[in-house]
C-alpha cells in the first residue's frame, strides 16, 4: 500500500479492482478544509482517461505488473499480435490498449508487454526506435542555415519533424516518449 502523497507520473495503482496509470497529479491545499490530490488516470485495459480526487494521505494499492519480452508479429485490423520469445505463446492486444504507441511498432520488433494477474494489459516501447523515412519533402541547398525542420512520414505511418538534410529512405532514431527526431542512423 502507498499513500496519495507518494504518487508519481507513470506509477500504476489499483482503484476499485481496476489498474490505472497516473498521467498527471497535483497536490492541492485549499485555504479551508483538508488537502487533497487531484489526478488524471489512464485505465490500462481500455486506455480511457478519467479524473479522480484522493484525500491527502489516502491509502491506495499499488498495482504490480509483470513484464515479458515479446516479438511483435502483425496487426490485423485493430488487433495487434505478439509472441513470447521464450514460450512462443501468442497474445493479442487491442489498439485501445496500446493507445498511441502503435505509431512506433513494426513487425519483428522486440517489445515489453505488461501483464496484471496473468492478463496482458499494455506494452512498453523501447525509449529509442530506428525507423525508415518513407516520405518527406526534398531539402533545398542552403536551407540548413536556419536550423529549421520539415515533417517526415515514417515506415510505420508516424509523422515527426526532421532536419532539412533528411531524405526519403534514410533511417532515423526517434524518441518514443516525445515523438522527436534524435539523429540520422543511416543515409541513402
UniProtKB/Swiss-Prot annotation:
Pathway info: Protein biosynthesis; polypeptide chain elongation
Source organism, top-level taxon: Bacteria
Coiled coil: none
UniProt xrefs under SMART domains: EFP, Elong-fact-P_C
Entry keywords, A to Z: Cytoplasm, Elongation factor, Protein biosynthesis
Cellular compartment(s): Cytoplasm
PROSITE patterns according to UniProt: EFP
Gene Ontology molecular functions: translation elongation factor activity
GO biological process: peptide biosynthetic process
Gene Ontology CC entries for this record: cytoplasm
Family, as annotated: Belongs to the elongation factor P family.
Its job: Involved in peptide bond synthesis. Stimulates efficient translation and peptide-bond synthesis on native or reconstituted 70S ribosomes in vitro. Probably functions indirectly by altering the affinity of the ribosome for aminoacyl-tRNA, thus increasing their reactivity as acceptors for peptidyl transferase.
Name of the molecule in the record: Elongation factor P
Gene label: efp
Amino acid at each position: 500500500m502507498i499513500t496519495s502523497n507518494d504518487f508519481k507520473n507513470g506509477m500504476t495503482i489499483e482503484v476499485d479492482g481496476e489498474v490505472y496509470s497516473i498521467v498527471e497529479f497535483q497536490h492541492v491545499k485549499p485555504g479551508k478544509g483538508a488537502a487533497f490530490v487531484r489526478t488524471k488516470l489512464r485505465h490500462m485495459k481500455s486506455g480511457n482517461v478519467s479524473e479522480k480526487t484522493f484525500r491527502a494521505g489516502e491509502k491506495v494499492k499499488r498495482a504490480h505488473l509483470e513484464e515479458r519480452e515479446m516479438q511483435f508479429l502483425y496487426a490485423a485490423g485493430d488487433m495487434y499480435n505478439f509472441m513470447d520469445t521464450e514460450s512462443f505463446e501468442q497474445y493479442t492486444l487491442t489498439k485501445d490498449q496500446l493507445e498511441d504507441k502503435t505509431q512506433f511498432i513494426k513487425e519483428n520488433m522486440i517489445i515489453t508487454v505488461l501483464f496484471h494477474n496473468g492478463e496482458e494489459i499494455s506494452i512498453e516501447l523501447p525509449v529509442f526506435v530506428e525507423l525508415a523515412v518513407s516520405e518527406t519533402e526534398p531539402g533545398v541547398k542552403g536551407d540548413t542555415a536556419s536550423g529549421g525542420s520539415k515533417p517526415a512520414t515514417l515506415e510505420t505511418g508516424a509523422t515527426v519533424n526532421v532536419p532539412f538534410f533528411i531524405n526519403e529512405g534514410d533511417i532515423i532514431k526517434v524518441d518514443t516518449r516525445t515523438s522527436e527526431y534524435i539523429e540520422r542512423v543511416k543515409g541513402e
